[in-house]
């Protein structure tokens, strides 16, 4: 059975951002020890270090709004590349911050985990 990579990408991003916005401490199950996060200029490897970084971000409340979501098959092995752009509403501020994020998803049984995660705020 063929996987609809667009559906997987959309469902993954909806779940990821809902979890991020409600309780970042619970994101660890989406990463593995070989996973890597580049957050602005910081690079971290391993689920524990990645979650520690995300939890340490200097805001209490955040809401992600996806503007665009593009996906492609990443390899014949079922990997999926996902590119997201959107807006962050931080601590109920009026002005949203624009961001870009790339996920490289790897199949893991009946689900996927994040192998690579690259996040950047977009300043203009």
Swiss-Prot record:
InterPro entries: NTF2 (IPR045875), NTF2-like_dom_sf (IPR032710), NTF2_dom (IPR002075), Nuclear_transport_factor_2_euk (IPR018222). This is Nuclear transport factor 2. The keyword Cytoplasm applies. Pfam families: NTF2. It is found in: Cytoplasm. Facilitates protein transport into the nucleus. Could be part of a multicomponent system of cytosolic factors that assemble at the pore complex during nuclear import. One of its GO terms (cellular component) is cytoplasm. The keyword Nucleotide-binding does not apply. Its main location: cytoplasm. Residues 8-121 form the NTF2 domain.
């Amino acid at each position: 059975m063929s996987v609809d990579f667009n559906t997987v990408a959309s469902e993954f991003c909806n779940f990821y951002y809902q979890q991020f916005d409600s309780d970042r401490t619970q994101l660890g199950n989406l990463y593995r020890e070989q996973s890597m996060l580049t957050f602005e200029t910081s690079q971290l490897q391993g689920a524990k270090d990645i979650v520690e970084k995300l939890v340490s971000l200097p805001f209490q409340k955040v809401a992600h709004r996806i503007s665009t979501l593009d996906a492609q098959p990443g390899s014949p092995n079922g990997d999926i590349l996902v590119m997201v752009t959107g807006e962050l509403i931080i601590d109920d501020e009026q002005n949203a911050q624009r961001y870009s994020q790339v996920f490289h998803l790897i199949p893991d049984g009946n689900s996927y985990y994040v192998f690579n995660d690259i996040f950047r705020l977009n300043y203009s």
